[in-house]
Amino acid sequence: LRGIEMKNYTAANIRNIGVFGHGGEGKTTLTEAMLFNAGLLERLGKVENGTTTTDYDPEEVKRTISINCALAPYEWKDVKVNIIDAPGFFDFYGEVTAAMAMADSALIVVGAVSGPVVGTEKAMDMCKKSGKARMIVVNQMDRENANFDKVMNELNEKFGPSVVPIQLPIMEGGKLVG
């Protein structure tokens, strides 16, 4: 492209973070929120409206699911962050495997209602086998019947005491406020 100067980054200033988990847990929505908070988007897209940055394929828009891995790069404090939004359904496991190979570390998204399910276990197992650092995000805390404590207990039962919260949801009157 003419007139556009690309910034050069050293390997030390690049982070490749895969976003993994079971289908429908909010991986694409989380990716969209990261892009919005980084200042790349003027508004948040919605999966159900077909307006997210990473679900751009017509089939993804029609089915309201991720089918392909999608790269969402942005800069944060002089570091290039490449978010790799991976599909959550097993029909697209090859894409998940490719995303894991590209990622240096992983965000594993777990629903606050469903808790850890098969996609959670698969992602954790892939991270363990490949030696990748991982962080679990308990997502969808604003949903009815969300239960952070229950999900944390289930995560500890499945994956051991090394799963510890670094941020706690603040609830008031049954509503998420922080």
Model-identified regions with their sequence ranges:
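Conserved C-terminal guanine-recognition region of P-loop GTPase G domains, centered on the G4
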Residues: M100-I166
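Feature targets compositionally biased, intrinsically disordered low-complexity regions
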Residues: L1-R2, I17, G173, V177
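Short acidic, glycine/serine/threonine-rich loops at helix termini
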Residues: T31-E32, K46, G94-V96, T120-E121, ...
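P-loop NTPase switch module centered on the Walker A-proximal segment
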Residues: G3-V110, P116, F159, P165
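Conserved nucleotide-binding/hydrolysis micro-motifs of P-loop NTPases
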Residues: E25, L41, F89-F90, V113-P116, ...
